[in-house]
């Protein structure tokens, strides 16, 4: 993702090297975490909360849209967010980084992600395989493209395609909904074998529970490389300096698409995210060791040497 690394110099200036041997300020004990209502971010944020709480921190989670979370970090009402999907959110995030309002981690917490428009496989087999094909199926689709929550960067990019009449989509309507609401609509369409175009992404159990295909030929409308994505951690601009121990944990907190998908299946089956996180840590002690290497308990000895 070349345009992500274009801003690496800016991010590096904001995320200075940590020194976990120094005692953190008392204010660092409270960790204010923003969580978007996306299952992947719920899973990773739950893992971070469980680990931080075990290290003696007091972690508070605020569930809100990505815009509210980013504004909360800018306004010093929140400390961090594990759900910056790049390039989908780059237009929102980069200006805030350049203005010194937020900071982005030096490395992503997830690679090999993907996010773009998708269709059920039966519709793909009927010939709706590319972005350019969508307009040909307008009547069957009811002139609708199904996105996620209102105000999301994803929806803004889909709406931009419509506003510019890109791919002949000028007369289409974007249907905004929550992740759960959108997927419920997809399942209803699947049961009727009805036509539907929706926003899909990896990691997510939808890739297993739904017979679906991603569209190609996006012409970078939702980012280069047909929706290839990475996920990054966002913090307060001075967080690495003020709370280097937490920052070290965040720098080391990286996930795989397979691991996230496994946790997401359990969450979507009705389990509480924190319970899923605890079970994951119990079954994967090597992850805990990797994430907490060189990280100290708050006000105490190192958790791992």
Briefly describe each language-model feature range.
Residues 253-305:
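C-terminal functional modules
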Residues 78-82, 153-219:
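Ligand-binding pocket segment of bilobal, Venus flytrap-like solute-binding proteins
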Residues 101-150:
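A conserved helix-loop-strand patch within extracytoplasmic ligand-binding domains
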Residues 38-39, 57-72, 173-185:
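Short helix-initiation/N-cap motifs at beta->coil->alpha
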Residues 48-55, 138-172, 282:
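Ligand-binding cleft/hinge of the Venus flytrap
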Residues 25-40, 57-62, 142-146, 250:
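Short, well-ordered beta-strand elements
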Residues 45, 65-100, 181, 185, ...:
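Pocket-flanking alpha-helical
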Residues 114-125, 228-242:
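A bilobed periplasmic-binding-protein/Venus flytrap-type ligand-binding module shared by bacterial periplasmic
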